[in-house]
């Protein structure tokens, strides 16, 4: 009988979320410096009538926590979200790094998801119009917004920025976005068409004919041509729009430094400046022998296609996919270069072993071109091995190229699918959510016969009907600052439980 009493005294009952768990006190002492290892009957959550400790926490996670005390192994429940699991472990005083290796990959998936969502937030893919408070915070005049002292420029600056940088914010912004895309397409089309022979005009040169009378003449030089004058006017109109767009976006940008160092904006600067540089240098082109070299700078304007990323979320995701796959792409290039050098050297010496009057591989640098074309499975056919040993090397080169390129591709595709799926799910998620107020501590019950507003602890003003000054609830309640901020016209749903 004494053994039974001793066993019952060593047992402890834990009621977590309405589910009762029973274990030994010695089990809870296995992991010191935790919440369960310091249980005493003096705690507020101890019920002397039921002889149990009550915790209003997640019961499913606590089952794994209690098993950790019993077995010394912490496993991750698959039906619980990662942040909730971390929050519960923090409440019980446990380290999340003690999760077993078998559950570690599943447990850390939420961290990858959080990083992905953070990246998507930086990409600015939202099509929903932000609130006035969010705009004030973004443009740095939040204090003036709360004080109600917003100037005319502070009010117009977000609107101008939305018109030129957020194409889906309003109908006017969509119109400006269409105009911007139109000028980009016209500029690229003009850049391509002006190189067509039918779109070029032969150069007319004046020469001096030395005759007895001394007359001047001219002739038509068909070997050298210039683009039609219409393309010059088209480029002037397009670059005038691009210059206006850059200036307006820079003036109205919320962060000037972030705007300057943006990769898309840098491309826009270079492409626009190249037009003006070309315009200045054309004045001196007639004095240069190779004036065509100046036209090389105009190739920078083709990079304006990257400006379309502002108007397409798919292009933003694609570029972010390549950024996230930088390690895999670097590894791919490394193995390609390694294979190209190896097989170029092998095919050079393989073709020299046997007599071959039609040897195309006169040097290893020529073999580098052949190895690159073969490993990428392009195969132009301009160079090909003629000997059996060279053919064997070519077969190995093609096989190695297929394996080298095919291995990193699934990783890149997986990254794109991950970003795209998160973007689609994020688009369906409502941006404005119902705010949940923090749960207040329950008030102590009022003792029988005690005056109104005096609780069992003898504290005035804590009764169920107490007013702001401890009276019987006759005066109006005072709203604290936190509740006052929540109950505002801008919040979707907020209640006060004072």
Curated annotation (Swiss-Prot):
InterPro entries: BTB/POZ_dom, Ion_trans_dom, K_chnl_volt-dep_Kv, K_chnl_volt-dep_Kv3, SKP1/BTB/POZ_sf, T1-type_BTB, VG_K_chnl, Volt_channel_dom_sf. It is a multi-pass membrane protein. GO terms for molecular function: delayed rectifier potassium channel activity; voltage-gated monoatomic cation channel activity; voltage-gated potassium channel activity. One of its GO terms (biological process) is protein homooligomerization. The keyword Metal-binding does not apply. It is found in: Membrane. The chain crosses the membrane at residues 175-193, 230-252, 263-284, 292-313, 329-350, 392-413. Keywords: Glycoprotein, Ion channel, Ion transport, Membrane, Potassium, Potassium channel, Potassium transport, Transmembrane, Transmembrane helix, Transport, Voltage-gated channel. A motif (Selectivity filter) lies at residues 377-382. Glycans are attached at residues 206, 213, 481. Residues 431-498 are annotated as: Disordered. The keyword Transmembrane helix applies. Residues 450-461 have a biased composition (Gly residues). GO terms for cellular component: axon terminus; dendrite membrane; neuronal cell body membrane; plasma membrane; postsynaptic membrane; presynaptic membrane; voltage-gated potassium channel complex. Heterotetramer of potassium channel proteins. The segment S4 is probably the voltage-sensor and is characterized by a series of positively charged amino acids at every third position. This channel protein belongs to the delayed rectifier class. PANTHER family: POTASSIUM VOLTAGE-GATED CHANNEL PROTEIN SHAW, VOLTAGE-GATED POTASSIUM CHANNEL. Belongs to the potassium channel family. C (Shaw) (TC 1.A.1.2) subfamily. Shaw sub-subfamily. Mediates the voltage-dependent potassium ion permeability of excitable membranes. Assuming opened or closed conformations in response to the voltage difference across the membrane, the protein forms a potassium-selective channel through which potassium ions may pass in accordance with their electrochemical gradient. This is Potassium voltage-gated channel protein Shaw. The lineage of its organism: Eukaryota, Metazoa, Ecdysozoa, Arthropoda, Hexapoda.
């Amino acid at each position: 009988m004494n053994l039974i009493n001793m066993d019952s005294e060593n047992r402890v009952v834990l009621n977590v979320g309405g589910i009762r768990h029973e274990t030994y006190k010695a089990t809870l002492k296995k992991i010191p410096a935790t919440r369960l290892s310091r249980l005493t009957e003096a705690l507020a959550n101890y019920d002397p009538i039921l002889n149990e400790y009550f915790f209003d926490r997640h019961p499913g996670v606590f089952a794994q926590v209690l098993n950790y005390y019993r077995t010394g192994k912490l496993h991750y429940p698959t039906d619980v979200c990662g942040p909730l699991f971390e929050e519960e472990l923090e409440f019980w005083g446990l380290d999340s790094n003690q999760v077993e290796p078998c559950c570690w990959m599943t447990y850390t998936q939420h961290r990858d998801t959080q990083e992905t969502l953070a990246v998507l937030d930086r990409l600015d893919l939202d099509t929903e119009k932000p609130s006035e408070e969010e705009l004030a915070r973004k443009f740095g005049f939040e204090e003036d917004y709360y004080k109600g002292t917003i100037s005319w420029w502070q009010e117009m600056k977000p609107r101008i920025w939305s018109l030129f940088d957020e194409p889906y914010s309003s109908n006017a912004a969509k119109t400006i976005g269409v105009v911007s895309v139109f000028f980009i397409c016209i500029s690229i089309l003009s850049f391509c068409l002006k190189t067509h022979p039918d779109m070029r005009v032969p150069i007319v040169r004046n020469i001096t004919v030395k005759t007895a009378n001394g007359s001047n003449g001219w002739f038509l030089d068909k070997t050298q041509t210039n683009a039609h004058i219409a393309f010059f006017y088209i480029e002037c109109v397009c670059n005038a729009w691009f210059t206006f767009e850059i200036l307006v976006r820079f003036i109205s940008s919320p962060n000037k430094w972030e705007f300057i160092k943006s990769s898309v904006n840098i491309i826009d600067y270079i492409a626009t400046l190249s037009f003006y540089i070309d315009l200045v240098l054309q004045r001196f082109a007639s004095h240069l022998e190779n004036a065509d070299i100046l036209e090389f700078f105009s190739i920078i304007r083709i990079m304006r296609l990257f400006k379309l990323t502002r108007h397409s979320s798919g292009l933003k995701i694609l570029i972010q996919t390549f950024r996230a796959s930088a390690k895999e792409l670097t590894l791919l290039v490394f193995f390609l270069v390694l294979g190209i050098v190896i097989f170029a050297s092998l095919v050079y010496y393989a073709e020299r072993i046997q007599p071959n009057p039609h040897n195309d591989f006169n040097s290893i640098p020529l073999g580098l071109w052949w190895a690159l074309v073969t490993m990428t499975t392009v195969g132009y056919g301009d160079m090909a091995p003629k000997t059996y040993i060279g053919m064997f090397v070519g077969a190995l080169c093609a096989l190695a190229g297929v394996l080298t390129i095919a291995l990193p591709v699934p990783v890149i595709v997986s990254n794109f699918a991950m970003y795209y799926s998160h973007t689609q799910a994020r688009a369906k998620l409502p941006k404005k959510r119902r705010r949940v107020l923090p749960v207040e501590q329950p008030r102590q019950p009022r003792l029988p016969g005690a005056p109104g507003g005096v609780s069992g602890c003898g504290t005035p003003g804590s009764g169920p009907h107490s007013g702001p000054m401890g009276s019987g609830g006759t005066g109006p309640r005072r709203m604290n600052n936190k509740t006052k901020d929540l109950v505002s016209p801008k919040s979707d749903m907020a209640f006060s439980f004072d």
